[in-house]
UniProtKB/Swiss-Prot annotation:
Belongs to the protein disulfide isomerase family. It catalyses: Catalyzes the rearrangement of -S-S- bonds in proteins. The modification Phosphothreonine is found at residue 133. One of its GO terms (molecular function) is protein disulfide isomerase activity. The modification N6-acetyllysine is found at residues 49, 163. It is found in: Endoplasmic reticulum; Endoplasmic reticulum lumen; Melanosome. The modification N6-succinyllysine is found at residue 44. It comes from Mesocricetus auratus (Golden hamster). GO terms for biological process: adaptive immune response; protein folding; response to endoplasmic reticulum stress. This is Protein disulfide-isomerase A3. Within the major histocompatibility complex class I (MHC I) peptide loading complex forms reversible disulfide-linked heterodimers with TAPBP as part of its protein folding chaperone activity. This is essential to assist the dynamic assembly of the MHC I complex with high affinity antigens in the endoplasmic reticulum. Phosphorylated.
Amino acid sequence: RLAPEYEAAATRYGVSGYPTLKDGEEAGAYDGPRTADGIVSHLKFISDKDASVVGFFRDLFSDGHSEFLKFAHTNVESLVKEYDDNGEGITLFRPSHLANKFEDKDLLTAYYDVDYEKKTFSHELSDFGLESTTGEVPVVAIRFVMQEEFSRFLQDYFDGNLKRYLKSEPIPETNDGPVKMDATANDVPSPYEVKGFPTIYFSPANKK
């Protein structure tokens, strides 16, 4: 017979057989092998520091759910509502040590330890109006050129306080000839796309 405090816990969590293994308030009962090796294997799985992928499904007999059973799944209503408004989907859960203060922000790609003198990267600086590599260059650029400390630059970017850099030649003193531009020295405005040279677009006079 269980001690009173354990009997209350067993009643609260619906424990009717032994051994029963539960993890968390909303977790379902462990339904794996009722052996020491099976339980240890399950505990190692849920305590592993690697990222976890959890599937949410409306239909427990769908092809997607059947395939996902090879990994992990849940149909606990509260969890489904908390992590997926549509009631179905796959969610990646990462350990907290991988989180940072810039989560849920724009995707940032940073180049570092790059030799801009090499041909492969020589055009990267010119795209941001930085033609010389002899002096200091920004740590990062996100269509904006960094002017100061890195974290402040990122915060200003996320707050929308940065002025976007557009590669552009000086305005010509005279511009009475055919409309033309050097796509290697200027950012091409939308909706035009340049994939080769020469590229010609026709815009009717009444649809500029």
